[in-house]
A protein has these predicted regions:
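Active-site catalytic microenvironments in core metabolic enzymes, especially phosphate/sugar-handling
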Residues: 1-238
């Protein structure tokens, strides 16, 4: 099986043409005709990730975030990114990134968050023109929960003791919106769609004021919101 076979398979759930314009997705390093000996799935391609791939004899890394994001003018190992890229090249390890192509997938990052939270009847929060792709998801809890109980449930679900949240509204939690990664841009959409709670990451201080008592905003952390992406990719590839 070649890298192209794997990339074609990944593009069935995360077509590259549905990635955001600013992003850098697809095969970043390597030749698509290369035979795949082993695949390492990761959230970020760190130097330790490449070392692990070498140790485990994996010549393809499937990463959520792209190690090459804004472009490189030189690859001489002077910066961290260059060092990682150079090590991958020297060891004939290809790197493929999905990032916002998977973010915009109906079965992508936010869908996995819904699954972990046990939401039902969920659909895309910010659908694109085709209606089948877009950022975030919104769905229902099987049973309503008190906000305090939902906050505890959220911490447990995302395996963290530290979350940030806006002032509780005093309402029961029925409808929940989620968006993996940085999601402050969708706060107004979550409110418009009558979500009781919006879970995402990287909210700034003043973003919490946008709740205006209409919604409970929860910032679980960037990594925490995307941590299940590895599971999603492994499940799809195996």
């Amino acid at each position: 099986m070649t890298i192209k076979n794997i990339s074609d398979y990944l593009e069935e759930i995360a077509p590259l043409n549905q990635a955001e314009d600013f992003d850098n997705v697809g095969l970043l390093i390597g030749n698509e005709t290369t035979e795949v000996e082993g695949i390492l799935v990761t959230l970020d391609t760190l130097e330790e990730t490449v070392d692990e791939a070498i140790k485990k004899k994996c010549n393809l890394i499937v990463s959520f975030h792209p190690i090459i994001f804004s472009g490189l003018k030189k690859i001489n190992g002077n910066s961290y990114v260059e060092k990682v890229v150079l090590k991958a090249i020297q060891n004939n390890i290809a790197i493929y990134a999905t990032h916002t192509a998977l973010d915009n997938s109906k079965v992508g990052v936010s869908s996995k968050m819904c699954e972990k939270l046990g939401l039902i009847n969920y659909n895309i929060l910010l659908p694109k023109e085709d209606g089948n792709t877009g950022m975030g998801m919104i769905g229902d809890l099987p049973k309503p929960m008190q906000e305090e109980d939902f906050l505890k449930f959220t911490k447990k679900t995302f395996k963290t003791n530290g979350i940030r949240f806006s002032n509780p509204t005093g309402n029961l939690v029925n409808k929940v919106a989620v968006l993996g990664g940085s999601g402050s841009f969708a706060i107004a959409d979550a409110i418009h769609k009558k979500a009781d709670v919006y879970i995402s990451a990287d909210f700034k201080y003043h973003d919490f004021f946008k709740a205006e008592g209409k919604i409970l905003l929860i910032d679980v952390g960037h990594y925490e919101s995307e941590q299940f992406t590895k599971n999603l990719l492994v499940e799809y590839l195996t």
